[in-house]
Amino acid sequence: MAREFSLEKTRNIGIMAHIDAGKTTTTERILYYTGRIHKIGETHEGASQMDWMEQEQDRGITITSAATTAAWEGHRVNIIDTPGHVDFTVEVERSLRVLDGAVTVLDAQSGVEPQTETVWRQATTYGVPRIVFVNKMDKLGANFEYSVSTLHDRLQANAAPIQLPIGAEDEFEAIIDLVEMKCFKYTNDLGTEIEEIEIPEDHLDRAEEARASLIEAVAETSDELMEKYLGDEEISVSELKEAIRQATTNVEFYPVLCGTAFKNKGVQLMLDAVIDYLPSPLDVKPIIGHRASNPEEEVIAKADDSAEFAALAFKVMTDPYVGKLTFFRVYSGTMTSGSYVKNSTKGKRERVGRLLQMHANSRQEIDTVYSGDIAAAVGLKDTGTGDTLCGEKNDIILESMEFPEPVIHLSVEPKSKADQDKMTQALVKLQEEDPTFHAHTDEETGQVIIGGMGELHLDILVDRMKKEFNVECNVGAPMVSYRETFKSSAQVQGKFSRQSGGRGQYGDVHIEFTPNETGAGFEFENAIVGGVVPREYIPSVEAGLKDAMENGVLAGYPLIDVKAKLYDGSYHDVDSSEMAFKIAASLALKEAAKKCDPVILEPMMKVTIEMPEEYMGDIMGDVTSRRGRVDGMEPRGNAQVVNAYVPLSEMLGYATSLRSHTQGRGTYTMYFDHYAEIPKSIAEDIIKKNKGE
């Protein structure tokens, strides 16, 4: 089957936003206008096409990024709907990795919200071009100008409107296109009938002023345009469009549009902007990988059907009908169903059973995937998130994804023996799907411990075990993942010597431990001169330190953010061994614990609480009583917003407390921000508890 849409006519986009900004509804409308669905499903009725998991429909939020394909104006648009809830940031991170562009949806009343900032930062890390859609223009308190100002103030983004709304709230009736200086009026409720009219007289000055600001913002990124602008020369529509496209693709400018997805206004114009301004796979820089056989050698995966096949698996999920589905993005070459591919990350050969083009939760079988496509494969047994798939003769590894460690843990216990086996299977499958979800058995207690990015994250996973795998389990109280670190430096010796007849054991190391920067992790430096510790034992010293650091030095929590410099030592020709040096390194760490001022660290969450003004005093007092540090307040519409950093241990069960403090009128979001030292008195309690005193 030949290629249906050329690479120039392909767009791979994500739709990202804060929870409740209307992201899923926006995607629904895109599918409606592109003819993919015939009846529009509303999220608040639990009937949305993209939210297909039962937990999503119950809660009205999007958890897994469903991938879907639509056609618009002769182009193929592959859309990934990403979750806006903070516990699911990993889903966003995964999808951004494989996108060429994104639409950031803002709520016209709130503008940029905390989760928007997080997702925006992630998109900037991956260099994803974006357009901004200010949604909910029909909502009470909708304010387009305010929303645009939050892009500048909170994100320092070079953004400018390419559209202006006429009216807001109930009066929102038309949209002015500043590039072509036209006006579009909606004449029916489904938004399918649009009338092009002249810009009304009373809005002309405002539109001309906004167009001048737009040209100025874009001209900053284009010398050619700047010359024309400064010389007061006429700038044609095609020149302006091309300059906006260039600046957007280079992530130097963000066009801002407006509309209301719920009331069906502005979505088609937003689709036009996706085609006009977001890049095709040919417009973005080719992805650079390296050879599996030689990590130093760079390999380019070019968007070209005739090149070697290379793809990245970005999501694994279990489908009730076809089993394990692996979603992947093709960067170069083509692949047919039934063929063999190589998983170069794991060095395994895999057979692709069937290829599916996804549409929320329905699917269409296809024979071939081409470069630039996003599809799902059935039959890949060993492939996980972040793995590279390539042709059998190829051995490219594309840059993988890094995922954060869990910050909260729970114990789960099956209710019956029958549940035991099912639970093991369920945990294996859920870990395959979600790299931030960890499960292990505690060696001392025999309990199964699961870890994730927040209470909601674990709630939903326990819920899925029950609904999808029929596993009934009892859930223990949440446990916070503490860490340990050193505050000062010291030089120490670790010596292991044992003679017990026959061959002995001997290893001797001198190591300097120093604190590392926050978040930098463990760094090992080999500074041995003259072979006082033979080269073959150096990896054992590093491995010994890493193993010992897993169990910490104070209360059994992993030791992080430490530098270790091996600068001296000695060995014995006969008695030295890898094991002896491993043990010597762990003894050095024990010695360092006495001299390096170890402390316990706790996860600090960035918390944003929104509530009516009258509860402000109560909430501030409550945050302080939870050892929180208030980081600022601001009005948002007729509500107040408090930003704070609060220890996770103090935020467990906060939803119930906030509800009672605000009579159910407050909302909050939180996500992990950093680790910070815990107060001494609390640290002492934790140490005692862990030692069973």
Curated annotation (Swiss-Prot):
Pfam annotation, one family: GTP_EFTU
CDD domains: EF-G, EFG_III, EFG_mtEFG1_IV, EFG_mtEFG_C, EFG_mtEFG_II
Keyword vocabulary terms for this entry: Cytoplasm, Elongation factor, GTP-binding, Nucleotide-binding, Protein biosynthesis
Start and end residues of each tr-type G domain: 8-282
Biological function: Catalyzes the GTP-dependent ribosomal translocation step during translation elongation. During this step, the ribosome changes from the pre-translocational (PRE) to the post-translocational (POST) state as the newly formed A-site-bound peptidyl-tRNA and P-site-bound deacylated tRNA move to the P and E sites, respectively. Catalyzes the coordinated movement of the two tRNA molecules, the mRNA and conformational changes in the ribosome.
Protein name: Elongation factor G
Residue sites binding GTP per the record: 17-24, 81-85, 135-138
Gene Ontology CC: one annotated term: cytoplasm
PANTHER family in the cross-refs: RIBOSOME-RELEASING FACTOR 2, MITOCHONDRIAL, TRANSLATION ELONGATION FACTOR G-RELATED
GO molecular function terms attached to this record: GTP binding; GTPase activity; translation elongation factor activity
Biological process, per Gene Ontology: ribosome disassembly
Family, per entry: Belongs to the TRAFAC class translation factor GTPase superfamily. Classic translation factor GTPase family. EF-G/EF-2 subfamily.
